[in-house]
């Protein structure tokens, strides 16, 4: 092995260790996986869900808690969908899996006018089917492959177009109250997952088989973030850190903070502010390393 090959192998191992560490941190911080859990890992055939399954399988061997997992793919009968790819890949890994066949494609095409975005209806149908599958399989958690950039994109979409400060939480209770959904890749950057997918040579299935128009709002947000990341290295890390450092007393939601009940007091007030001072931020703050929670105990994997 020559010097260039050794360097490439070193970088690949370094990336793999970093992704495993970040997933372990997310699992620990949000108590995503508990002893005896049965995870339903949703596998779409995209880079993120492949990486999620790969990393969870690796961590499963060394985790301090015992858990089972089963990979689930929803075949929505989109024309041209390569039905053999996922079964062949999963069987090569020896992973338990379930392919759920539901022709939601025809339903969506019948309901949504030609040329319109089908993603919203498609996702609602998919969610209902996957919830039902989780119950059938006895899954205690549903694992999705959303990463840090997805979380930030959703935050800006909701703020710019929905008028709400809401992101995509690493762990949530489903709308029907019967399922816990986890996102173990919450601390992982998309560009790292792209590199990882290339190194692992995952058999990627295109995501545009349905022929739907791209979500233009999300594409605009993605382009904005990509430009920021290029022009201001570290800005995305700072923004993600902000989602973990919320101060309701310094926002304007009276349902989260009792503004009406504020009273003067003689002693210093921890949530007080210097009302007449302008906020000053150091330029170096945008170059700070990623933040993944303070004073947390990280799951250790060998």
From Swiss-Prot:
Broad EC category: transferase
Residue window of motif PP-loop motif: 44-49
Cofactor, how bound (note): Binds 1 [4Fe-4S] cluster per subunit. The cluster is chelated by three Cys residues, the fourth Fe has a free coordination site that may bind a sulfur atom transferred from the persulfide of IscS.
Subcellular location: Cytoplasm
Gene Ontology MF terms: 4 iron, 4 sulfur cluster binding; ATP binding; magnesium ion binding; sulfurtransferase activity; tRNA binding
Pfam families registered for this protein in UniProt: ATP_bind_3
Keyword line: 4Fe-4S, ATP-binding, Cytoplasm, Iron, Iron-sulfur, Magnesium, Metal-binding, Nucleotide-binding, RNA-binding, Transferase, tRNA processing, tRNA-binding
Main localization of the protein described in the UniProt heading: cytoplasm
Cofactor(s) the protein requires to work: Mg(2+); [4Fe-4S] cluster
Pathway(s) annotated for this protein in UniProt: tRNA modification
UniProt keyword Flavoprotein, yes or no: no
Binding site residues for [4Fe-4S] cluster: 119, 122, 210
Catalytic reactions on record: cytidine(32) in tRNA + S-sulfanyl-L-cysteinyl-[cysteine desulfurase] + AH2 + ATP = 2-thiocytidine(32) in tRNA + L-cysteinyl-[cysteine desulfurase] + A + AMP + diphosphate + H(+)
UniProt xrefs under InterPro entries: Rossmann-like_a/b/a_fold, TilS/TtcA_N, tRNA_Cyd_32_2_STrfase, tRNA_thiolation_TtcA_Ctu1
A biological process term (GO) from this entry: tRNA thio-modification
Similarity comment: Belongs to the TtcA family.
Job of this protein: Catalyzes the ATP-dependent 2-thiolation of cytidine in position 32 of tRNA, to form 2-thiocytidine (s(2)C32). The sulfur atoms are provided by the cysteine/cysteine desulfurase (IscS) system.
Subunit structure: Homodimer.
Further comment: The thiolation reaction likely consists of two steps: a first activation step by ATP to form an adenylated intermediate of the target base of tRNA, and a second nucleophilic substitution step of the sulfur (S) atom supplied by the hydrosulfide attached to the Fe-S cluster.
HAMAP family per the UniProt record, alphabetical: TtcA
Name of the protein in its database record: tRNA-cytidine(32) 2-sulfurtransferase
Species: Nitrosococcus oceani (strain ATCC 19707 / BCRC 17464 / JCM 30415 / NCIMB 11848 / C-107)
Gene responsible for this protein: ttcA
